[in-house]
């Protein structure tokens, strides 16, 4: 039961994290929008950069990117909360039923990992060369979040071997 509860609490912590991220991105919209804008414009990358042809200068596209990120984070938060509730309801269930209840959490964590790795590290970091910016480099934060979600995903994905008590 302790392992099951541990998995629920860790997933709830991820849900809270995403809830706070969405809260911060909406209540401090401009600060976080500036991050997205500068990454897409590539205006703080290294001088002489030959990849600047990739830069996007359209404010409308910057807004679409940013709103898409917020939406992705909000969906991840909702799915994590929903999965946490499903798992809590299955705390006393059979191992098979508890494992089944974890599936939505596995999907939610995967969705979160795709944002940090796919959007921030791959697209932001490599396509828009975010790693070259001293001011707008979010690669470290993205890697931290990707790693945290990955560890929780691995732990959550372990099969439940305890019998219900």
Protein language model annotation of sequence segments:
Residues 23-31:
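Helix-to-loop transition at the C-terminal end of transmembrane segments
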Residues 30-61:
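Membrane-interface interhelical connector segments
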Residues 1-24, 65-67, 71, 75-165:
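Extended, low-polarity transmembrane helix blocks
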């Amino acid at each position: 039961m302790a392992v099951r509860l541990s998995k629920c609490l860790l997933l709830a912590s991820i849900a809270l994290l995403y809830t706070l991220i969405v809260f911060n991105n909406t209540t401090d919209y401009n600060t976080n929008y500036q991050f997205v804008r500068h990454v897409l414009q590539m205006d703080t990358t290294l001088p002489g950069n030959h990849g600047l042809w990739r830069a996007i200068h359209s404010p409308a596209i910057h807004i679409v990117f940013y709103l898409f990120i917020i939406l992705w984070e909000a969906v991840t938060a909702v799915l994590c909360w929903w999965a946490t509730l499903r798992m809590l309801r299955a705390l006393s269930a059979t191992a098979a039923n508890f494992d089944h209840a974890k599936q939505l959490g596995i999907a939610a964590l995967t969705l979160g990992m795709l944002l940090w790795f796919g959007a921030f590290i791959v697209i932001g970091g490599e396509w828009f060369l975010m790693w070259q910016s001293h001011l707008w480099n979010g690669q470290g934060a993205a890697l931290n979040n990707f790693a945290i979600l990955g560890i929780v995903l691995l732990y959550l994905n372990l099969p439940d071997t305890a019998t219900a008590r």
